[in-house]
């Protein structure tokens, strides 16, 4: 199965966690970066384009601040990132140069991908770099990011980048061998799972737990990333990045780590962007009838199905769509503002112009702009 998947891969996103290329005491692990660069160069030799999402800037910079552990405050984290990002890029630049490969740095915030024009511009930039034989190295712009525009962790960022660059595979390098039935660091009976056909609620529950002492992402964030790219029909392989040769085993189609198969029905790129990259500006609660036609029949949301509107947003905003009990089941781009939607909620589409004095259309959210989660 893996060999068949790898045959189709022409572009891969490789996410490297902090725990893979740094240590608690010594900052960056130069030997590990050297080994990974050599393995990624082998991908290039086999005709596979590589986009790298790398953590490690904060961990690389914290020693310069005299911190013995992961920064706990936002100013500390941003200062460590400002110091460490240049150290991280210099390490990659030196090791890839040994293989005749140039690298480029891209620092992103969520706003860069939530804005459709900036999303497309970022894609064009990365495509150009790849056409020139350059490996893009992407990280969150920790030096300026605030809670409202942060990705949360680089697992999430890697999933969004996989959609952005239209890769055929996401590889997540971590400091354990893959996905286990329990945390192998605390449970000696934990068993490695080589194949996950579908990410279920049970899978997500088994993934509970925190990250390493130098990173922010735990197993739960990695499962969430695999689920997101799976919605676009893209598989994920999670493997131990601290073990030399594992990346080459992945490329060869060897059963190493854990393979997460994609969902049966995949979202197109734009709907994936709506569902996972846009930051919702409000909430629209619908009645049970609207819930059924949206979730089961793929219809548009009409004003008659709207029960309540929460938040202030303009036309064209992304909103959460919820059942009467508050459970989110979909997201969509609105054709009306929150003020307009409040006025026409519960009314028939034919009444819109009489109520507002104008009319954009019959739907408050068109089915082409609506994604059931």
Swiss-Prot record:
Q: What PROSITE patterns does the entry give?
A: GLUTAMATE_5_KINASE, PUA
| Reaction equations catalysed | L-glutamate + ATP = L-glutamyl 5-phosphate + ADP
Where ATP binds, per the record, is at 15, 174-175, 216-222
Q: Which organism is it from?
A: Geotalea daltonii (strain DSM 22248 / JCM 15807 / FRC-32) (Geobacter daltonii)
Positions annotated to bind substrate: 55, 142, 154
Report the function annotation for this chain: Catalyzes the transfer of a phosphate group to glutamate to form L-glutamate 5-phosphate.
Provide GO CC annotations from the record.
cytosol
What is the protein's name according to its record?
Answer: Glutamate 5-kinase
Keywords, sorted A to Z: Amino-acid biosynthesis, ATP-binding, Cytoplasm, Kinase, Nucleotide-binding, Proline biosynthesis, Transferase
Q: Provide the gene name from the record.
A: proB
Q: Name one GO biological process term.
A: L-proline biosynthetic process
User: Any idea which GO molecular function terms this record carries?
Assistant: ATP binding; glutamate 5-kinase activity; RNA binding
């Amino acid at each position: 199965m893996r060999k068949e998947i790898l045959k189709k891969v022409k572009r891969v996103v490789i996410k490297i966690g902090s725990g893979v290329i740094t240590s608690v005491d010594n900052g960056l692990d130069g030997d590990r970066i050297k080994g990974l660069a050599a393995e990624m160069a082998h991908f290039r030799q086999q005709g596979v384009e590589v986009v790298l999402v790398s953590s490690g800037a904060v961990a690389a910079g914290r020693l310069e601040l005299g911190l013995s552990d992961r920064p706990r405050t936002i100013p500390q984290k941003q200062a460590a990132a400002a110091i460490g990002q240049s150290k991280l890029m210099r390490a990659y630049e030196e090791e890839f140069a040994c293989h005749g490969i140039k690298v480029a740095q891209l620092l992103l915030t969520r706003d860069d991908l939530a804005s459709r024009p900036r999303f497309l511009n970022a894609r064009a930039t990365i495509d150009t770099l790849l056409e020139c034989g350059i490996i893009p190295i992407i990280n969150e712009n920790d030096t300026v990011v605030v809670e409202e525009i942060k990705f949360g962790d680089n697992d999430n960022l890697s999933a969004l980048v996989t959609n952005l660059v239209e890769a055929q595979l996401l590889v997540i390098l971590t400091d354990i061998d893959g996905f286990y039935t329990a945390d192998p660091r605390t449970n000696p009976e934990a068993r490695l799972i080589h194949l996950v056909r579908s990410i279920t609620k049970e899978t997500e529950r088994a993934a509970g737990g925190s990250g390493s002492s130098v990173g922010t992402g735990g197993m739960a964030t990695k499962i969430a990333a695999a689920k997101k790219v799976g919605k676009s029909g893209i598989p994920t392989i999670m493997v131990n990045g601290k073990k030399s040769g594992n990346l080459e085993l992945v490329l060869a189609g060897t059963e190493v780590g854990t393979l997460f198969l994609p969902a049966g029905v995949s979202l197109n790129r734009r709907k994936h962007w709506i569902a996972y990259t846009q930051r919702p500006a409000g909430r629209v609660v619908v009645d049970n009838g609207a819930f059924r036609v949206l979730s089961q029949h793929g219809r548009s949301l009409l004003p008659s199905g709207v029960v309540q509107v929460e938040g202030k947003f303009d036309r064209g905003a992304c909103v959460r769509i919820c059942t009467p009990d508050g459970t989110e089941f979909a997201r969509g781009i609105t054709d009306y503002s929150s003020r307009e939607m409040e006025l026409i909620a519960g009314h028939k589409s034919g009444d819109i112009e009489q109520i507002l004095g104008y009319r954009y259309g019959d739907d408050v959210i068109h089915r082409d702009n609506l994604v059931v989660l």
